[in-house]
Regions:
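Acidic/polar loop-and-plug regions of large Gram-negative outer-membrane beta-barrel proteins
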Residues: 148-152, 165-171, 175-236, 251-297, ...
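Structural signature of Gram-negative outer-membrane beta-barrels, strongest in the C-terminal barrel
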Residues: 169-171, 297, 316-328, 366-484, ...
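Membrane-embedded beta-barrel scaffold of Gram-negative outer-membrane proteins
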Residues: 234-236, 242-248, 252-258, 431, ...
Length: 651
């Protein structure tokens, strides 16, 4: 009954497609583009950056571009396309990615053990066990443990991933439910890249490196530790009136030592005069520097609401009132060597020694805090038997504080209205439409180092939804349009200068008014027969500013995703295709384009007995060479063909 495009990535689908990490998942979502830049990915949807996420429907503003949460801890992922400001507050009209945690739902001892072997010495083992903690099963526990080690197609790259997750769910009384849990993920990556390879030879033609080549050294690393804790209480107050209280805490620690090579700019110009590669010598001259940082980000969330159903005119209605609080704190200690312009790097032997200790000199502390509160009132009303109105309003306050007081800012009493209609014109078909407004403080800065004004606008969506084959197959068709002012647009080859006026590595942006994104989306999910599962989606959109200039050109305008599986007796055979249309960055001689491409994937599974399954997954079946990310005079290659063999034992 949500008047927007909705999709659920089930645990069965995640297992079948061998999707184990957050970054892997992003590449399979219709309408979502994820431009990779070293260990980080920057997802966009409908032409706008994805800037918030949800855990058990509680919003989080702490980014996940580098921490890459492991999906072993989650039961499913729920996706709501478009603006979702009523329930989340400040944010872009892109997509709400809701990570639903696993819970202890079984009153009997159950579990699953799995082990995987894959390309580039990829080994992982997972234990997932649920059990009653009391004789009647009213108190239950679940524990998930995972260990993974992996090399890579990239020279010198190694990764180790460790996950620990536990949750206790309790039915304290017939009217009181409580859940408490915590998780820890340690992700260590050595031999990492920071940025991409040069895109051009010195004669202006495009480079063509082996996909194994990266700019890195054996002393580089990128480590993250993520700690989460949460508590939920659901209390039935009287009749059908329910109180929900949610609290969550996240702590992200990051430590890096990195090597950077990029273009140099002459006399403050915007066109690089170095950073290319000589074809004859395979050497490049450009800007070389090292970097180290230690970052700690903590976040506290409180989400509480009361839902009260009632009857009016013989029809069922519901009102929800809630309050949300979110505060994130960030502390960063960083240092690095001065940028060395005119440095030479040999792309036949990139490994470069570390000139000195970069982790204990010239440390700077930049603490800051962002606080957001919001109160909302929403209702679902049946106006006539086939016609429902979903409407609400949210009032938000947002404040950013830095210890030095620089760029402190706040916005109070920002009102976000929402309205939607759902009309069930046949038993299995409905039409819907929705409207909401948008408010988002900008975290991008202009060339003077000043934060841009908040973006604002509105989003419209209308479409059809239908059920087929006795509800086993769902289809939806949506048309959407979003208009925004004060949208941040990167200024090509312009970076924010430091105190001496020299360019840093921080991209400079400008505000653009009249940005309009519009498009169409179709999705089909479910079972065609009892043996045949199908998931298909395709999205096309355009995004331009008031002058007709394309914005967010790093996002493919058309994306399509297909995954299907057919089961016969003990065998299951399936596969998928992920398609992305062309995307580009830069202009003129500095323009870099990734042409349209499609990646094919294959899976074959066999039930050895009723408890044991073997499954083979092959990604990039035809070994397509493509750019997973592009930037200023640089690009990042995607993974070549790779395979994983998994054994699962379930009891």
């Amino acid at each position: 009954e949500t008047p927007q495009s909705v999709k659920v990535l089930t645990r069965e689908y995640l297992d079948d497609a061998n999707i184990n990490s957050f970054q892997d998942m992003l590449n399979t979502v219709t309408g979502l583009a994820a431009n990779r830049w070293d260990e980080r990915q920057y997802p966009t949807a409908r032409g706008f950056e994805v800037d918030y996420y949800l855990f058990d429907s509680v919003p989080s503003t702490v980014g996940m571009d580098a921490s890459d949460p492991d999906l072993t801890m989650y039961d499913r992922v729920e996706l709501v396309k478009g603006a979702n400001g009523l329930m989340t507050g400040a944010g872009n009209p892109a997509i709400a990615i809701n990570m639903i945690r696993k819970h202890a739902d079984s009153k009997e001892l159950t579990g699953r053990l799995s082990t995987s072997f894959g390309s580039w010495d990829n080994y992982s083992s997972t234990v997932d066990i649920s059990a009653p903690l009391t004789r009647d099963g009213d108190v239950r526990g679940r524990l998930v443990v995972k260990h993974e080690t992996k090399d890579s197609f990239m020279d010198g790259y190694e990764k180790e991933n460790n996950v620990l997750y536990g949750v206790i769910d309790a039915d304290l009384t017939d009217s009181t439910y409580v859940s408490v849990g915590a998780s820890y993920q340690n992700l260590e990556r050595d031999g990492v890249r920071w940025g991409g390879l040069p895109a051009f030879y010195s004669d202006g033609t495009r480079t063509n490196f082996d996909r194994s080549k990266i700019i890195s050294s054996d002393w580089t690393y990128w480590d993250t530790d993520t700690i989460s804790a949460f508590a939920t209480m659901k209390q039935k107050l009287f009749k059908d009136v329910n109180l929900n209280i949610n609290y969550s805490y996240r702590e992200l620690k990051q430590e890096t030592a990195l090597l950077y090579f990029g273009p140099s700019y002459a006399n403050g110009g915007t066109v690089p005069n170095t950073g290319t590669v000589d074809k004859a010598t395979n050497q490049g001259v450009g800007s070389l520097s090292t970097w180290s940082d230690r970052t700690k980000t903590t976040e506290n969330n409180i989400d509480t609401f009361i839902s009260a159903p009632f009857t009016l005119g013989g029809l069922q209605q519901e009102v929800v009132a809630g309050f949300m609080y979110n505060q994130s704190k960030n502390d960063t200690w960083y240092s690095g060597s001065p940028t060395l312009s005119g440095a030479t790097i040999d792309f036949d032997d990139i490994n470069m020694p570390l000139a000195g200790d970069i982790s204990n000199t010239n440390l700077y502390q930049v603490p800051n805090k962002t606080t957001q509160t919001g109160a909302y009132l929403a209702g679902k009303f049946i106006l006539l038997e086939p016609l429902k109105l979903i409407t609400g309003v949210r009032v938000s306050n947002w404040k950013y504080e830095s210890e030095d007081g620089v760029n402190n800012r706040k916005f109070n009493n920002e009102v976000t209205p929402y309205a939607g209609l759902v009309f069930d014109f046949l038993d299995d078909y409905s039409w819907y439409a929705s409207y909401t407004e948008i408010f988002k403080p900008e975290d991008k800065r202009n060339v003077n180092g000043e934060y841009l004004d908040p973006r604002n606008g509105n989003s419209l969506e209308t479409g059809l939804k239908g059920e087929f084959l006795d509800g086993q197959l769902n289809a939806s068709l949506a048309v959407f349009k979003t208009q925004q002012d004060n949208v941040a647009e990167a200024i090509d080859n312009v970076f924010i200068p430091d105190a001496n006026g020299d360019p840093t590595k921080e991209q400079a942006y400008r505000s653009v008014d009249g940005v309009e994104s519009k498009g169409i989306e179709f999705e089909l999910d479910g079972k065609i027969t009892n043996n045949w599962d199908m998931s298909f989606g395709i999205t096309h959109f355009s995004a331009e500013d008031a002058a007709g200039k394309k914005v967010e050109t790093l996002a493919s305008r058309t994306t399509a995703n297909l995954f299907t599986k057919y089961t016969l007796d003990k065998w299951s055979v399936g596969g998928g295709v992920n398609y992305k249309s062309a995307f580009y960055t830069g202009e003129g001689s500095q323009k870099i384009t990734q042409d349209a491409y499609a990646l094919a994937n294959l899976m074959v599974a066999y039930d050895i007995d009723q408890n044991i399954k073997a499954q083979l997954n092959i990604n990039n079946l035809f070994d397509k060479k493509y750019y997973e990310g592009i930037g200023v005079n640089s690009m990042v290659y995607g993974e070549p063909r790779n395979a994983t063999l998994t054994f699962r034992y379930q009891f």
